[in-house]
């Protein structure tokens, strides 16, 4: 009986993180193979066509996160842990403006004229106050093809969005702004995640 129970237990809850079960899903008529344990929304944890899939991965391992620990009275006062995850969303774009085109044609209308060079080829340009992106900054490394739109640190830490289009779907990655101090590593991680999600079933 114990063996039967083990075999019937959902694979996303028991598969080792080093080799998670993968689900073939179609988003925007584009095939992706996603680790079941990385799917954040239970109703999205199935194969076949979907409008959107929301995922999370630990960084820098890029493995699905472990199941959250149950919070009790003895743990609720513990210090909040730093974010160590990349959140990813795959959504059908329905022929909306591509992310790279938005960077070229939309964002410049709302950016300040001056830019600030940062470490290792990264540039920062602030969005003007009173615009749709007021209170945010655009980070770009043109030679590396890296762009991220980020909120600023306030009551909560700033977060960044990096987007890319894959055929009929847009991938949106979210990660802490503080990670930009090692932006090349983050950019490489996003490239690897994209390749993994587009990889063959296995």
What does each model-found stretch correspond to?
Residues 1-10:
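Hydrophobic membrane-insertion alpha-helices, especially the h-region
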Residues 33-91:
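Extracytoplasmic/periplasmic/luminal assembly and interaction segments
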Residues 38, 152, 175-177:
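A mature extracytoplasmic/lumenal domain signature
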Residues 168-202:
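Surface-exposed amphipathic alpha-helical segments
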Residues 75-159:
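Non-cytosolic head/periplasmic domains of membrane-anchored proteins
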